[in-house]
């Protein structure tokens, strides 16, 4: 058999992703409870988490579900689940790569109309926990370490209120305990408002401009068990319409910052001042608007160094006719709008994107893009014949900072049309190739295995914090080979309402060894030389 050649950034090599959902035993169906009254939550959910809840080395899967909605529903109602068909679902991965539904045993069915999920070990006991966002009140599930979870929301003080969407864990004050950012969409209830034409079949979901913005929630982890809501004390008082949140230290000052994708208003970039407070710098950093100075419908987001200059960049998805926004880090606290120079403008103009993550699908050392797509309005084709409610997911190959659409050649899944929403990435089978899960509104979830043929090498790290938080979230990992230097922030956040594998993954191209540097949240810098490729390497934080 002839050996496969190693890909180079200039090669337009497609991926190969295979839908293994049914073969893996995943039978989840999202129930959005669509009604003729077009209540907005019906079209917005929901998310997914890829995480290893039992520490067996294999990723498990958590899928968020809706709840019944009556037509009409009285204003002020908070929908609740009333049967197993509306349960959120936890799937445990067996030794053979198939999944078993363990929701009932684990006790993580959810309570209300679910939106998103964020996974991380908030109490540093070695087991990842789950925070589930909902319309109304959210839920914190503590992982007991025996295959079960306990609802500790009330004790922890993190129920929140309103309509929560994406959430992310981050140790913003670097005290060794993970804090929690929770986005809220807007001030909305079940008032019966007619939007769209009065013609039969033309009623539409209402535009967010009709509703008031609302502040996000920031919970400080006090002692590993209790949280305190500190958004006002932290200087986070500007109201938004938040849908996506991503974490990175974009200015290399040692403190994690975060970006909020807002819907149809300016975007927010919160700079961590290093004293427990944040400053919103979206406009001055040139990330608050698009390249033409306009707002857009920000939905999904990811913070990642796509051009391998070791500085985190930003991608934000939005609605059709707006173009996905790519911001290249200028190394001085500002960003350049790179949508045109990267090739994204022409590729994404007619598409609507939600969940998005940078991933190196072919392990050539350059971060590619995977995007879940679909319009928010199921009536969009009635007014705009060139736009579609159901869309195919999109795979874009990064060729040295320029993106090429390789979707059509990358598997049958990229020809299917879905109402895509959430997206999480992770190495499901630990073969060194990044896989993905995409959720759809009122439809199935799809497990996509990466079968891309490539001789390129790879390296994945599993960080174990000691002075830092146990998951190492917020650590900046730099991997250097003879040809490339790459950097990733350790995070489970980003995308839309979803949570990805915490283990940072690096494609190495032809290189068989790499040097690794980890800047832990504690301030400790740890270096490993000549690390052999093709492995998942566990790295425990040094004590000093």
Region spans (language model):
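Hydrophobic beta-strand segments that make up the repeating blades of beta-propeller
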Residues: 58-65, 125-134, 180-184, 257-262, ...
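Gly/Ser/Thr/Pro-enriched helix-cap/hinge segments flanking short amphipathic alpha-helices
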Residues: 34, 343-346, 378, 386-544
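Repeat-based blade/solenoid architectures
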Residues: 26-47, 84, 106-118, 157-168, ...
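Asp-box/WD-like beta-propeller blade repeats and closely related beta-sheet repeat scaffolds
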Residues: 102-122, 127, 132-172, 182-209, ...
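Beta-propeller blade signature
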Residues: 86-93, 214-222, 271, 328, ...
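Short, conserved, GDST-rich strand-edge loop motifs in beta-rich repeat architectures
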Residues: 64-83, 184-211, 371-389
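Beta-propeller blade termini
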Residues: 45-55, 92, 113-127, 142, ...
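Blade-edge beta-strand/turn elements of extracellular beta-propeller
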Residues: 17-20, 98-108, 146-158, 225-236, ...
């Amino acid at each position: 058999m002839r050996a496969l050649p190693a890909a180079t950034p200039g090669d337009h090599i497609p991926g190969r992703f295979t839908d293994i959902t049914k073969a893996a035993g995943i039978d989840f169906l999202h129930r959005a409870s669509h009604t003729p009254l077009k209540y907005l939550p019906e079209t917005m959910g929901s998310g997914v988490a890829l995480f290893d809840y039992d520490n067996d080395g294999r990723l498990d899967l958590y899928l968020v579900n809706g709840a019944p909605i009556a037509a009409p529903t009285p204003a002020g109602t908070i929908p609740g689940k009333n049967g197993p068909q509306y349960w959120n679902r936890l799937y445990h991965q067996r030794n053979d790569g198939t999944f078993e539904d363990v929701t009932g045993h684990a006790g993580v069915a959810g309570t209300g109309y679910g939106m998103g999920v964020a996974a991380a070990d908030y109490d540093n006991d070695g087991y990842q926990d789950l925070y589930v966002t909902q319309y109304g009140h959210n839920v914190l599930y503590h992982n007991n370490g025996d295959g079960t979870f306990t609802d500790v929301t009330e004790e922890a003080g993190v129920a929140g209120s309103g309509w929560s969407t994406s959430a992310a864990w981050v140790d913003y004050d670097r005290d060794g305990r993970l804090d929690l950012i929770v986005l809220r969409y807007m001030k909305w209830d079940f008032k019966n408002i007619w939007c769209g034409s009065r013609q039969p079949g033309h009623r539409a979901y209402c535009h967010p401009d009709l509703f008031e913005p609302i502040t996000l929630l920031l919970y400080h982890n006090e002692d590993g068990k209790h949280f305190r809501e500190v958004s006002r004390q932290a200087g986070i008082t500007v109201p938004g319409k938040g849908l996506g949140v991503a974490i990175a230290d974009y200015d290399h000052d040692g403190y994690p910052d975060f970006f909020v994708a807002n819907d149809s208003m300016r975007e927010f970039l919160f700079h961590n001042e290093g004293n427990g407070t944040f400053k919103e710098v979206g406009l001055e950093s040139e990330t608050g608007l698009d390249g033409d100075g306009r707002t857009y419908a920000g939905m999904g987001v990811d913070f990642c160094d796509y051009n391998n200059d070791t500085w985190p960049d930003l991608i934000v998805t939005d609605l059709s006719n707006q173009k996905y926004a790519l911001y290249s880090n200028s190394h001085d606290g500002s960003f350049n709008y790179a949508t045109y120079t990267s090739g994204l403008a022409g590729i994404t103009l007619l598409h609507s994107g939600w969940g998005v993550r940078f991933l190196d699908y072919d392990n050539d050392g350059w971060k590619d893009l995977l995007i879940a797509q679909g319009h928010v309005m199921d009536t969009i084709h009635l007014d705009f014949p060139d736009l579609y409610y159901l869309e195919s997911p999109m795979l874009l190959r990064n060729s040295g900072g320029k993106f090429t659409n390789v979707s059509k050649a990358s598997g049958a899944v990229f020809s299917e049309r879905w109402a895509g929403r959430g997206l999480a990435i992770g190495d499901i089978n630990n073969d060194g190739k990044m896989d993905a899960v995409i959720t759809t509104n009122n439809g199935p979830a799809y497990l996509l295995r990466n079968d891309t043929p490539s001789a390129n090498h790879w390296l994945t790290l599993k960080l174990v914090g000691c002075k830092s938080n146990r998951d190492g979230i917020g650590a900046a990992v730099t991997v250097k080979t003879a040809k490339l230097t790459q950097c990733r922030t350790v995070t489970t956040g980003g995308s839309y309402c979803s949570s990805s594998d915490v283990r940072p993954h690096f494609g190495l191209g032809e290189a068989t060894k790499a040097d690794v540097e980890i800047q832990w949240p504690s301030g400790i810098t740890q270096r490993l030389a000549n690390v052999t490729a093709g492995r998942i390497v566990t790295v425990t934080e040094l004590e000093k």
